[in-house]
Amino acid sequence: METVDTSQRLARLRELMKERNVDVYLVPSEDSHQSEYIAPCDGRREFISGFSGSAGCAIVSMTKAALSTDGRYFNQASKQLDNNWLLLKRGIESMPTWQEWTAEQLEGGKVVGVDPSLITASDARSLSETIKRSGGSLLGVQENLVDLVWGKDRPCRPSEKVTVHPVEFAGKSFEEKITDLRKELEKKKSAGFVVSMLDEVAWLFNLRGNDIPYNPVFFSYAIITPSTADLYIDEEKLSADVKKHLGDKVSLKPYTSIFEDAKALGQSAQAEVNGGASDPPRKFFISTKASWSLSLALGGANKVEEVRSPISDAKAIKNDTELEGMRACHIRDGAALTKYFAWLENELVNKKTVLNEVEASDKLEEIRSKQKNFVGLSFDTISSSGPNAAVVHYKAERNNCSIIDPEAVYLCDSGAQYLDGTTDTTRTLHFGEPTEKERKAYTLVLKGMIAIDTAIFPKGTTGFSLDTLARQFLWKEGLDYLHGTGHGVGSYLNVHEGPIGIGTRVQYSETPLSVGNVISDEPGYYEDGKFGIRIENIIMAREVKTTFSFGERPWLGFEHVTMTPLCRKLTDPSLLNDAEKKWINEYHSEVWEKTSGYFAEDELTRNWLKRETQPI
């Protein structure tokens, strides 16, 4: 991982701040749609700080600069940040939050500036209150200052073609989805909903794009009212097939006209109030993740209502077609991973081939690309050997990566986009003789993964409540990991999908798990500079039968869909109880049954799979 000298960039940014009377400038990670993964043109935080992780916030004052990120990226950030930057480790008690650190810089009534399109309206309000208590004020700076520093070197905004996602994969027409949304809006007496999240627009209209790497979304907004459906998108992105798909049920408008139209809607609502309507005027809804800019355009906090997105909740509960697609694509994807691991072991151990991390991941992509319905990867493959496996979101650079050491742990976290689903699988392997500590760590992580997989819980339980099941065995040894245990997964959409998850984030306590949720199960353990362990399966929430039904509530459990062998060499059977051994043996029997047919004429892979799925 290379460190970028940010001195000149910071100096130029501070010049621009001074010209605009801004004392502290915030650079969030997100784009104007609050996307977790962004297009290169929106990589402002990475440009100004040198840190390339997917989460974090940069804060620049006239004399200092700080970068806040979470536990997934502590190791990576410490390597990528140069001496201009202070690393604020989120969640560490001795460290201030980035909001607290910002407030500490504000003595004497200073001004904090931020691009209002890059933070949510609710975050702007809470940040403003924090800043006020320190004597400062928050200013929305319409012109993005990092863009000015970046200048002509900033990548252009993508404008890739949009495609139709057929109902044979979506399971429901876009007309039905809009009808369902309108019913929800009517229940809440809303004038309409402004859709700002890219995956929500894609899901609602059964469309997919390619504007953000690995995420099949496209730059757009939408406004849905009781009688209209407007899609804000650059029309050159739309083929004749897409226009035919939308028909006369959707009005197409330029992407950049959303704020002008939002302002007009806000003024119309205000005119209704001024006209003394007998009924309370209906407000437009925006998601709690919508930008401060969008809220201001609609008239601000008193004129617009921020709500949990009804689209986000609907999208998280997969229909039967989507669930069947997830099962099918994970079998094919599991076969691809099995072929890759068999190939990799043969190259490293039998042929003594020298392979680096990128060469290996290239081979995996080649194998995956031959699978039915393959579209592309769902994220940048994490192919990490030895100490690199301790970097949770490690990225091997093509011209600067490690040779895979057969005598060290190898962690591979990878996934793909298929027309019928999205995959995300992590396996940790060893091609030599693992140490006792590596085997123990792996087995403790495996026990946690099994505990989530086999959990049974009453309807209404959240992922926040389940999280300790995955950590309990590590905790007994005084060990832990600094990332969530699971995230929601889209259906040929974003591999990280809200609002559900398993972990300690506040939002995971707000959304109960429901039948049809698709979520990852991925505990881990990492020792900086030594090795890392992570095991990840994708699981789907379903209703289960129990002997009793306390409170007459439905009870839920999980169905795993990932079909890839676990690592026998790293598993210590002496640390497993009988139920866990039974689970592993039954899982491996299922993997063999569902994937071995792919290798009828591939003796190498078939033999590897047979060996790895033998009972323990």
UniProtKB/Swiss-Prot annotation:
Binds 2 manganese ions per subunit. GO terms for cellular component: cytoplasm. GO terms for biological process: proteolysis. Keywords: Aminopeptidase, Hydrolase, Manganese, Metal-binding, Metalloprotease, Protease. The lineage of its organism: Eukaryota, Fungi, Dikarya, Ascomycota, Pezizomycotina. Mn(2+) 1 binds at D424, E522, E536. PANTHER family: XAA-PRO AMINOPEPTIDASE 1 (PTHR43763:SF6). CDD domains: APP. Pfam families: Creatinase_N, Creatinase_N_2, Peptidase_M24, Peptidase_M24_C. Its cofactor is Mn(2+). It comes from Paracoccidioides brasiliensis (strain Pb18). Belongs to the peptidase M24B family. It comes from the Eukaryota. It catalyses: Release of any N-terminal amino acid, including proline, that is linked to proline, even from a dipeptide or tripeptide. The keyword rRNA-binding does not apply. This is Probable Xaa-Pro aminopeptidase P. One of its GO terms (molecular function) is metal ion binding. PROSITE patterns: PROLINE_PEPTIDASE. Mn(2+) 2 binds at D413, D424, E536.
